[in-house]
Amino acid sequence: MSNKKIIFFTGGGTGGHVFPGISIIQKLKEFDNEIEFFWIGKKNSIEEKLIKEQDNIKFISIPCGKLRRYFSFKNFTDFFKVILGIIKSFYVLKKYKPQLIYATGGFVSTPAIIASSLLKIKSITHEMDLDPGLATKINSKFANNIHISFKESEKYFKNYKNIIYTGSPIRREFLNPDPKIIKQLTQNTNKPIISILGGSLGANALNNLALCIKKDAEIYFIHQSGKNLNDLSEKNYLRRQFFNAEEMASIVKFSNLIISRAGAGAIKEFANAGACAILIPFKKGSRGDQIKNAKLLTNQNACIYIDEDEILNINILKIIKKTLKDREKINSLKENIKKFNNKHSSTLIAKLLIKDIKETKSK
């Protein structure tokens, strides 16, 4: 075992599988600046882009194939990509000899977790959503520990002993958002601010919704569209493909109302901010994870839920304006969503990993 302290992270596909890992690394650096960090992911991916924006995290790409629950001819070619990913991960981990590997989700994480098991390197997989995805289900068979973001997720891991409720880490920029930023973005508007957030990859349904309602003169709209639309600034409308972490933190905290998908990472950021949110979970082509996330919050009166198929059949503006006028409802939604926040998540996980490193190096 190397004398160096090394931790590998792996995960990707969306920002929701990357931002929690970045948060953990930020906290680990506060506790121990001697730890070296690596991130295994897919080439030319969202995880490569986000990790290369960070300081002192080395990115290593591997071949990877998507894990599917349904028949597709791509399953045959992707199977071999997974095998190649395991082989490359094996040699990478053997070369650097990390004490730990931490998976934050997504199919790209599975080859590295399997390789770590072959090399007897301690591994941990973190499920961000309420119910585990296929990648986490596979990872959990090889990992030493499982971290979960929702307490309610324990029922999906009844046959596993090493389950730890950690919550989902959020980026440090979200801990103390600056109100001046949203004022600058909205040209110091006095209008209520509605933010339509499509996530790191954008969301066509939310983009179309934004284009339909943005002309309402009584509201200022902030729209994060992803790369499919160009940046645009109008009198009561600001559209960006992406906002940086400081901007997004201010938007989430100080918007009057947020319209968003229901990814676990976004929900945890809304919970931290005590945001009033309308959630429209991704439905078509998904495994239903966002729907379960949104329904969990709805059952505890922590969000307004709208089915994606109903977007064109209902008057969203009417719902928005009715909600804005109902101060009691807004306060209730804000307080209830806070119950899903574990503000010490990054610290808890960082301390667990440091403990694991010490135990590994002492052997």
Curated annotation (Swiss-Prot):
This is UDP-N-acetylglucosamine--N-acetylmuramyl-(pentapeptide) pyrophosphoryl-undecaprenol N-acetylglucosamine transferase. InterPro entries: GlcNAc_MurG, Glyco_trans_28_C, GlycoTrans_28_N. Keywords: Cell cycle, Cell division, Cell inner membrane, Cell membrane, Cell shape, Cell wall biogenesis/degradation, Glycosyltransferase, Membrane, Peptidoglycan synthesis, Transferase. Gene3D superfamilies: Glycogen Phosphorylase B. UDP-N-acetyl-alpha-D-glucosamine binds at T14, G15, G16, R171, S200, Q290. Belongs to the glycosyltransferase 28 family. MurG subfamily. It comes from the Bacteria. GO terms for cellular component: plasma membrane. It is a peripheral membrane protein. Its main location: membrane. It is found in: Cell inner membrane. The keyword Repeat does not apply. One of its GO terms (biological process) is cell wall organization. Pathway: Cell wall biogenesis; peptidoglycan biosynthesis. One of its GO terms (molecular function) is UDP-N-acetyl-D-glucosamine:N-acetylmuramoyl-L-alanyl-D-glutamyl-meso-2,6-diaminopimelyl-D-alanyl-D-alanine-diphosphoundecaprenol 4-beta-N-acetylglucosaminlytransferase activity. Its EC number is 2.4.1.227. Cell wall formation. Catalyzes the transfer of a GlcNAc subunit on undecaprenyl-pyrophosphoryl-MurNAc-pentapeptide (lipid intermediate I) to form undecaprenyl-pyrophosphoryl-MurNAc-(pentapeptide)GlcNAc (lipid intermediate II).
